[in-house]
Amino acid sequence: SSVVRLEKLLDEHAPGALLVKHEQNLGKGGAVISGLEAARAAGYSHAIQVDADGQHDPKALESIHGQSCIYPDRIICGQPVFDENISRVRYYFRFLTTYLAWAETLSTEIKDALCGLRAYPLDAVLKLVRGGGRRLRMDFDPEILVRAVWADIPLHYVSVHVSYPVDGTSHFQYIRDNFYISWMHTRLLFGMLPRSPVLLARKVKRMLGRPRP
C-alpha cells in the first residue's frame, strides 16, 4: 500500500519523521489540515506544505523556509514560473481561479490561488480552519488564502519553477474537484458581501499611504 511505501521511504531518508495516517482518504485539504494540527501539537510554530506530484522545484523549499523566518507572521506562498509544458486549459483555469479570488477579497493580494507550495504560521492558519476554512478537497488551497486576506493575515510570495511532466500523475479529479471549487467560489463571493465595508476601508487606508506594518 502507499502507507507501507511511505514508511519505508521515511525510514530510509527521514528517520524519526512523523507520518500521520488515516483509515480513509480525507482529500488534499484534509491531509494538509491533519499535518498542520499534528505539527502544532508537536510544538512547531510553522509548517511547510508541498504537493506530492513533483511539479515544484525542490530548491524553492530553502527560499520558502528562509522567507518564513524573516516574515514569521505571513503565509509564504509559491508564485509559479511555468515551463512550456503547461496546457492552455490549466493555465487559464489558474488565472480564472486567481481572478475570482481577487473579486472575493476586493484586492489583488493573492498572486496565485492554487500553488501548493507554502509555509504557514500555524496558530493563525489553524484559527482560520476552525473559523470555517476546513475544506477537505482541492478547494482548501484557494479558500484558505481568501480567508487569510479577510482576516488581514499578510501574504508573501516566492517565485517557484513549476513543471508538469508529460507522463506525470495528477490527483485532480476534474468533475468532482471542479464542482467543489465552483461551490467554493459561490460561497466566498457571498461571504465577501458582509465583509466588503471592512475590506474596502482597509483598501482605502493603504491607498492613502498607510501600508501594512
Where are these regions (language model features)?
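Hydrophobic helical membrane-anchoring modules
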Residues: 131-213
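Acidic donor-binding/catalytic loop of UDP-sugar-dependent glycosyltransferases
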Residues: 1-4, 51-67
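Conserved beta-strand segments of alpha/beta enzyme cores
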Residues: 16-18, 109, 154-156
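Short loop/turn motifs at secondary-structure junctions
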Residues: 15, 43-44, 72, 152-154
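Short beta-strand segments at enzyme active-site cores
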Residues: 45-50, 158
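Acceptor/aglycone-binding surface of glycosyltransferases and processive sugar-polymer synthases
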Residues: 22-24, 28-41, 46, 58-138, ...
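Anion (oxyanion) recognition and catalysis
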Residues: 11, 69, 149
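Acidic donor-binding segment of Leloir-type glycosyltransferases
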Residues: 1-20
